[in-house]
Amino acid sequence: KPLDCSIYYDFCQNFFKQKGGNLSKDVFEQIYHQFNGHTWYIQCIMNRLYETELTIYCIEQVNVALLSILQGREPQFENMVQFFTENQFALLKAIAKDDIVTQPTSGKFIKEHKLSGASSVKAALKVLEDKELVYRTNEGYIIYDRFMDLWLKRI
């Protein structure tokens, strides 16, 4: 269960206050909700912002920090995807594009993303799940690594 947003905000805000800065509650809440309260991703972004900014007042600052994080991880992601089949990589990008996919083997999803047939998607999905790159939630399939998800959306 994620930390309560207001408690987490107070914790992060305290660090910015200690160095004479400020963290906008609205901006923090956007980060919190974008990453579903997942501490690791939020902390990574907060650390980057703390290193580079005194006051956080707009989402554009967060976007710059996120871009920097993604660029730093790009070699890792590029190295990883070279081991995927074309079908696996296409499915990863399709799931990232849709954020969450309830029926990855549906004709609509396959056609919309120009994927191979349902059996190919099913086989690719199994491999991606086994490698813990795709995760099935109660709502549907998502890219497990939220930073990889953002990177896939950009390519």
Kindly give the residue locations of the regions a language model identified.
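Amphipathic alpha-helical "lid/sensor" segments that cap RecA-like P-loop NTPase cores
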Residues: 5-76, 138
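A short helix-turn-beta junction within AAA+ P-loop NTPase domains corresponding to the substrate/partner-engaging
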Residues: 1-2
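C-terminal leucine-rich, beta-strand-based interaction scaffolds used for sensing/assembly
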Residues: 26-29, 71-155
